[in-house]
């Protein structure tokens, strides 16, 4: 059993690998791989494991796409591929030729996926129905050989989205309602098949979950954005043949009215709400859903106990533009027209059998009324389908409400919901036949368009009121204007008389003023002439002043240029004076130096003493003259130049004498220097000879180095040639590995084909054993054995042709695709016990652990973890995994990935390691137990199942050691808080997980050292409950034995 749990994900990974390989096959290839959810199914091993990993939690009346065993791809495999001696008979149902008739009732079918209970109970049986959505057909199995085929307008698998269902079923009806036609959308089917989910799901948290009601109103409100369309709704339920208002629960037992002339059905007492937007509708719909009757049954946790009818009234004005253009016209063309349409969305309560649904008490009465109304509806459908003259619509209030939907003037779309389980064969057949009969009904679709006299009346009344008010306003305005004009006329007459008097007076005054102004104007002309003459004179003076101003500016420019030149000249003179002063100071310094030198040579230069005194006197006189002539630049410069020349002549003479003396002294110094230089040359010559010798030595060293370099060059050339040969060899090896990889893929496809054939043989075996007896079962078991032997032969041939060592080498490839395919093959091989030893001997465990530690690819992590889980079933592999730190590495995987499939594989591997007594303490030290508890926090039912299995294995091994006397003290699990976790999860829905938790609690309770912890956590009550309610006899017996023998529990 543990082998099937640990290797199921490996089979899934191998399936995906084969699909990936098949994508690269040419389009016309004959090697197509047939895959299903049971590909690569290998023999199971016995251990404490979870019986299934691919469980799906069942939500309230909701189709789920997570269950692979209930997908249509499995059940849609062609029966012709299965080997059977009995031919398969298929009976075709009549195809409907009037698909384009807009009045025909459109019928669609939707299949609910298997729930968790059906996955366990129906695991060995094929699906009851087989869907063919491409050709819009459904096959219903009668038995293993016979099936009936039915055609529908739409066929939806269990993976179909809510949006796709709405667009296929309801959207054409909604569009017709917007165009003015009545419409009906209805869901019919057995209880628990997803009617309320399909029609009435609100989808508050997830918009993708919204049902037909919400999506239909969303489309209608989107088109009703203009003011010409109004949308109103009413929401009723038919509960036990009583019509109740879901929007006003106090309204009970509302009556139904029928118009004798038109035959229209109405419910006048229902609450009608004007819908503004989608949020408003969702609030109203939530109120109605809250008031609807529901109950918990065996087949559905929230089973609807009433028929819900949502009625949407759409009113649309047709000539809005004409009314705006001619608001006052009263002709026939001005009468507004309106289109009234009505949409019924009906969520029927599910038909059910009391013995299967487990109803009792008041729910039996509810079921009677539900079945009664549905029976009446079925009778009406039968009568309409058969063309009967009498339609029994008055047998039930439901048929009266739906009178216009079947055989009336509405466009009707029916969706029937069915389940995949064979336990409800009769209910599924009845539902399908109901849909087939409904497809024969053709309604007379009519467009309801009428004159809107009410709107016209209101508009005319508004116009009359407006015109009356306008006439009164005009009369008042006319009277007020008349009084105002009379008043203004009187004022004008008075003002005219006064103006006439003022005009006569003013004319006399103006004549006098005119005479005075003429005289003053003549005087002003004279003054103007005088000012003109003065202006000409001033103009001439201005011209003269301008000329003077130009001359003045020119003189100023010349003066400024002169001043600039003067300033430059003065600066030049000052620089020259400063230079002469500096030269005089330099001469004084030189003279003083000469004095010092002459005093030292008195015997030789005695004749120069007088000249030196005269020079000092001349210098004194020169300085005095220089001070006197500071204000006269030119004279002072000339005198200074003369004195300077004389002083230079004298100083030159003195310098000549000094040079002669120095020359004598320098001759002696030159001789001594030549001696010194000769000595230095000798020393340098010796150094040069030494340098020559060292140079010769270095030259020899360089020659030796050069020879070494030549040898190294030859060696490097040889290494380069060797590297080229190695590269060529590696290229050949790479090509060889690629060819081996292609062989590996080919063998993998053959293996999968064999496994697929084995699955078909297994299904046929299970069916044949139930119907054909022992003889047919034995024949098919022999075929199954042959298929299994063929599979083992294929795996053996795969190992022999390619070799496990080469496959493990491909795991280290840099090509990610090659690496993924290689690890999938290793995982597939690891599921076979014969290959596990070879993988361990070839270093497969080290390679997989290294891959898990270093890789970041989710696919590699998932498949490698599955391979490790398979290898962990082998004792030798367990030793190697623990010695290489595999437990700690697996425990840390919870921080590396959150993929539930990967974590399930890791939990399965740790659970297998928990079954070895040698590693209990080491698993705790390397945080293996803590890692399992951390993985259980994900909430995934499959991961929790593996964690529970691991705890049961650990507790079982501890109990065995304690009974054999090899261990004492509290359980290691209690130190990690496992007891609290087991207690809190002991009521989990999964039967296998609950069994493992019960086993773990019983094994822990056998150790008396754990008694205080059981009392502290309240787990004793769980032991008591297990002794009474456990589904396994052996577990109940063990719990009772513990309660009797343990004094701490009995007290």
Curated annotation (Swiss-Prot):
Domain of life: Eukaryota
InterPro entries in alphabetical order: ARM-like, ARM-type_fold, Armadillo, KIF11-like, Kinesin_motor_CS, Kinesin_motor_dom, Kinesin_motor_dom_sf, P-loop_NTPase
Annotated localization: Cytoplasm, Cytoskeleton; Cytoplasm, Cytoskeleton, Spindle; Cytoplasm, Cytoskeleton, Phragmoplast
Basic and acidic residues biased stretches: 753-766
GO annotations of cellular component type: microtubule; phragmoplast; spindle
Record bears the keyword Repeat: yes
Self-association and partners: Interacts (via C-terminus) with NEK5.
Name the record gives this protein: Kinesin-like protein KIN-UC
Organism: Arabidopsis thaliana (Mouse-ear cress)
Gene: KINUC
């Amino acid at each position: 059993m543990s082998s099937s749990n640990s290797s199921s994900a490996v089979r899934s990974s191998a399936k995906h690998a084969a699909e990936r390989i098949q994508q690269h096959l040419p389009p016309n290839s004959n090697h197509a791989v047939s895959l299903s959810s049971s590909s690569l199914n290998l023999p199971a091993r016995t251990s404490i494991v979870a019986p299934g990993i691919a469980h799906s939690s069942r939500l309230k009346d909701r189709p789920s796409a997570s269950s692979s065993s209930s997908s249509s791809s499995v059940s849609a495999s062609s029966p012709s591929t299965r080997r059977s001696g009995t031919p398969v008979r298929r009976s075709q149902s009549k195809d409907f030729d009037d698909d384009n008739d807009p009045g025909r009732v459109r019928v669609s079918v939707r299949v609910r996926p298997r729930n968790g209970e059906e996955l366990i109970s129906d695991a060995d049986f094929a699906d009851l129905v087989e869907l063919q959505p491409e050709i819009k057909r459904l096959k219903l199995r009668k038995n293993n050989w016979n099936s009936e085929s039915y055609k529908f307008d739409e066929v939806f698998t269990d993976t179909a989205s809510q949006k796709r269902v709405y667009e296929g079923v309801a959207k054409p009806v909604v569009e017709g309602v917007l165009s003015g036609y009545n419409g009906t959308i209805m869901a019919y089917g057995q209880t628990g098949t997803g009617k309320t989910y399909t029609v009435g799901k609100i989808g508050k948290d997830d918009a993708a979950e919204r049902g037909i009601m919400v999506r239909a109103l969303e489309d209608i409100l989107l088109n009703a954005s203009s003011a010409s369309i109004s949308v109103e709704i009413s929401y009723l339920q038919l509960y036990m043949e009583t019509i109740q208002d879901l929007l006003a629960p106090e309204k009970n037992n509302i009556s139904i009215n029928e118009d004798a002339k038109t035959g229209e059905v109405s419910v006048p007492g229902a609450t009608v709400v004007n819908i503004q937007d989608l949020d408003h509708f969702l609030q109203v719909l939530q109120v109605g859903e809250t008031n609807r009757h529901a109950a918990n049954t065996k087949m559905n946790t929230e089973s609807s106990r009433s028929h819900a009818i949502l009625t949407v009234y759409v009113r649309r004005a047709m000539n809005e533009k004409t009314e705006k253009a001619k608001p006052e016209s009263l002709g026939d063309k001005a009468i507004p027209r309106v289109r009234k349409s009505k949409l019924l969305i009906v969520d029927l309560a599910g038909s059910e059998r009391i013995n299967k649904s487990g109803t009792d008490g008041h729910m039996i009465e509810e079921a009677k009324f539900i079945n009664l109304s549905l029976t009446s509806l079925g009778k009406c459908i039968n009568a309409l389908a058969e063309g009967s003259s009498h339609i029994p619509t008055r047998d039930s209030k439901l048929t009266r409400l739906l009178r216009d939907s079947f055989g009336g003037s509405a466009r009707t779309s029916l969706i029937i919901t069915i389940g995949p389980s064979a336990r409800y064969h009769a209910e599924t057949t009845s539902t399908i036949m109901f849909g087939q009969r409904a497809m024969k009904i053709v309604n007379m679709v009519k467009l309801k368009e009428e004159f809107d006299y009410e709107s016209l009346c209101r508009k005319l009344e508004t116009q009359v009121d407006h015109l009356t008010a306008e006439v009164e306003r005009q009369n008042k305005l006319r009277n007020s204007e008349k009084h105002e004009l009379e008043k203004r006329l009187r004022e004008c007459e008075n003002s005219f008389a006064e103006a006439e008097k003022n005009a006569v007076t003013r004319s006399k005054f103006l004549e006098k003023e005119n005479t005075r102004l003429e005289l003053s104007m003549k005087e002003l002309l004279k003054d103007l002439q005088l000012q003109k003459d003065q202006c000409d004179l001033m103009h001439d003076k201005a011209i003269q002043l301008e000329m003077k101003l130009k001359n003045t500016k020119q003189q100023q420019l010349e003066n400024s240029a002169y001043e600039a030149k003067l300033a430059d000249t003065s600066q030049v003179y000052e620089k020259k004076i400063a230079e002469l002063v500096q030269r005089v100071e330099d001469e004084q310094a030189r003279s003083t130096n000469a004095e010092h030198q002459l005093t030292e040579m008195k015997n030789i230069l005695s004749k120069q003493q007088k000249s030196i005194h005269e020079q000092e006197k001349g210098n004194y006189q020169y300085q005095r003259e220089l001070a006197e002539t500071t204000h006269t630049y030119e004279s002072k410069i000339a005198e200074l130049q003369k004195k300077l020349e004389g002083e230079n002549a004298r100083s030159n003479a003195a310098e000549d004498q000094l040079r002669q003396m120095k020359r004598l002294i320098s001759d002696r110094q030159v001789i001594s220097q030549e001696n010194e230089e000769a000595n230095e040359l000798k020393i340098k010559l010796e150094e040069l000879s030494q340098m020559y010798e060292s140079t010769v030595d270095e030259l020899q060293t360089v020659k030796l180095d050069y020879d070494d370099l030549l040898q190294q060059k030859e060696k490097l050339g040889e290494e380069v040639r060797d590297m080229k040969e190695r590269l060529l060899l590696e290229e050949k090896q790479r090509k060889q590995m690629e060819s081996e990889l292609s062989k590996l893929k080919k063998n993998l496809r053959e293996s999968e084909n064999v496994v697929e054939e084995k699955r078909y043989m297994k299904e046929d075996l299970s069916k044949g054993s139930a119907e054909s007896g022992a003889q047919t079962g034995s024949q098919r078991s022999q075929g199954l054995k042959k298929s299994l032997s063929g599979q083992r032969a294929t795996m053996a041939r795969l190992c022999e042709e390619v070799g496990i060592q080469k496959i493990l080498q491909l795991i280290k490839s840099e090509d990610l695709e090659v690496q993924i395919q290689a690890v999938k093959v290793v995982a597939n091989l690891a599921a076979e016990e014969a290959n596990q030893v070879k993988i361990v001997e070839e270093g497969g465990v080290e390679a997989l652990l290294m891959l898990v530690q270093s890789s970041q690819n989710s696919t590699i992590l998932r498949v490698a973890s599955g391979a490790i889980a398979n290898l962990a079933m082998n004792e030798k592999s367990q030793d190697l995994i623990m010695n290489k730190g595999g437990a700690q590495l697996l425990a840390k995987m919870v921080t590396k990935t959150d993929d539930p499939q990967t974590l399930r594989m890791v939990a399965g591997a740790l659970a297998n390691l928990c079954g070895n007594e040698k590693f209990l303490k080491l698993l705790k030290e390397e945080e293996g137990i803590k890692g399992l508890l951390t993985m259980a926090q994900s909430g995934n039912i499959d991961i929790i199942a593996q964690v529970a299995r691991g705890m049961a294995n650990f507790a079982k091994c501890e109990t065995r050691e304690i009974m054999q006397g090899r261990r004492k003290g509290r359980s290691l699990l209690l130190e990690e808080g496992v007891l609290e976790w087991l207690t809190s999860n002991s009521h989990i829905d999964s039967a296998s997980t609950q069994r493992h938790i019960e086993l773990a609690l019983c094994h822990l309770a056998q150790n008396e050292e754990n008694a205080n912890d059981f009392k502290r956590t309240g787990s004793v009550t769980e032991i008591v409950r297990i002794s009474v309610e456990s589904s396994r006899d052996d577990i109940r017996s063990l719990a009772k034995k513990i309660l009797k023998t343990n004094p701490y529990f009995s007290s």
